[in-house]
């Protein structure tokens, strides 16, 4: 995908599918942008390969996206992207991943992950950082780091974005239009 997919704060709820490898987008090209999108209560299964919530390979930008639910696979799992050669900014994951070698945000990072947070069973946001940069972000454990901490950290990284995170009534971040933007 090489266009701009602006979810405009919308939610896709109950996405449930199984394929050899499973993700919403296969490849996000260097010119591609996916932003302001929430996937809620997904159930994804990669029957012979890997599974990721948003994209298999990111070469573009993923901004202000989130995934909740269960992601499992014959191979490895990730909440947002399997491999990152671009930018992932102010995203979060909360759910269940296959425990073996999983990254809540990304499995292999070769570029930039900024202010991304996660909850659920994953211990690491980035499973393997291969020359990339990880700036900010943490596991939300409810004691040291709470979801409000995540909201504040993500919004700091979203300067100029048309949506910001706010703490929803269910205790998890939700997207809200930034009234300061046109």
Language model regions located:
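Predominantly extracellular beta-rich ligand-binding scaffolds that present long acidic/polar faces
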Residues: 1-182
């Amino acid at each position: 995908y090489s266009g701009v997919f602006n979810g405009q704060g919308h939610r896709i709820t109950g996405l449930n599918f199984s394929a050899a490898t499973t993700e919403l987008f296969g490849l996000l090209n260097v010119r591609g942008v996916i932003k302001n999108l929430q996937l809620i209560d997904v159930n994804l299964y990669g029957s012979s390969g890997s599974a990721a919530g948003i994209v298999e390979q990111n070469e573009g930008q993923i901004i202000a996206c989130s995934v909740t639910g269960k992601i499992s696979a014959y191979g490895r799992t990730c909440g947002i992207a399997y491999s990152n050669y671009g930018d992932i900014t102010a995203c979060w994951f909360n759910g269940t991943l296959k425990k073996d070698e999983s990254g809540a945000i990304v499995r292999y990072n070769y570029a930039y992950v900024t202010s991304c947070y996660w909850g659920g069973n994953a211990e690491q946001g980035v499973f393997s950082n291969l020359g990339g940069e990880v700036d900010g972000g943490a596991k939300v454990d409810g004691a040291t780091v709470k979801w409000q901490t995540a909201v504040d950290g993500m919004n700091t990284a979203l300067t100029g974005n048309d949506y910001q995170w706010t703490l929803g009534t269910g205790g998890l971040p939700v997207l809200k239009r930034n009234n300061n933007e046109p």
